[in-house]
C-alpha cells in the first residue's frame, strides 16, 4: 500500500500518444520556445534527441533592453522568471554520443543520410 502523500509527490511519466518513435532533430539554433518544446517531448517515453547540442536559455522571460547613456553598452533584464522550470538556466540539450551529428548542419542531404543510418 502506498502512502497517499508520497504517491502524490511522485511525478508520473506521461504515456506516449505516438505509436512511432519520436526523434527530435536539433542544431545549435534551437533556443527559447524550441527548448520549451524539447522539455515537453523529452518527457515522453522512447523519445530520442538527435543532431547537435542546442542553444541554452535562462529562466527569465519578457526581456527588456535599455541602451545606457554612453551608447557603449545596453542593459537587458527579465520581467518574469520561470522559477520551477525543471531545466536550469543556461543548460543546453546534448544528444547521446550515438545520436550526435558531427557533419555540416547546412547539408540537408548529409543530415538525412546520417539519420537514415541511425534508424536502420
Predicted regions and their residues:
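C-terminal "post-core" interaction segments
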Residues: 1-120
Amino acid at each position: 500500500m502506498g502512502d497517499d502523500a508520497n504517491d502524490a509527490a511522485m511525478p508520473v511519466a506521461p504515456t506516449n500518444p505516438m505509436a512511432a518513435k519520436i526523434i527530435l532533430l536539433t542544431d545549435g539554433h534551437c533556443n527559447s520556445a524550441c527548448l520549451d518544446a524539447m522539455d515537453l517531448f523529452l518527457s515522453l517515453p522512447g523519445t530520442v534527441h538527435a543532431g547537435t547540442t542546442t542553444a541554452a536559455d535562462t529562466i527569465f522571460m519578457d526581456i527588456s533592453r535599455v541602451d545606457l547613456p554612453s551608447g557603449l553598452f545596453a542593459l537587458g533584464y527579465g520581467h518574469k522568471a520561470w522559477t520551477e522550470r525543471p531545466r536550469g538556466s543556461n543548460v543546453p540539450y546534448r544528444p547521446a554520443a550515438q545520436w550526435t551529428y558531427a557533419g555540416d548542419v547546412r547539408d540537408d542531404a548529409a543530415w538525412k543520410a546520417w539519420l537514415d543510418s541511425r534508424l536502420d
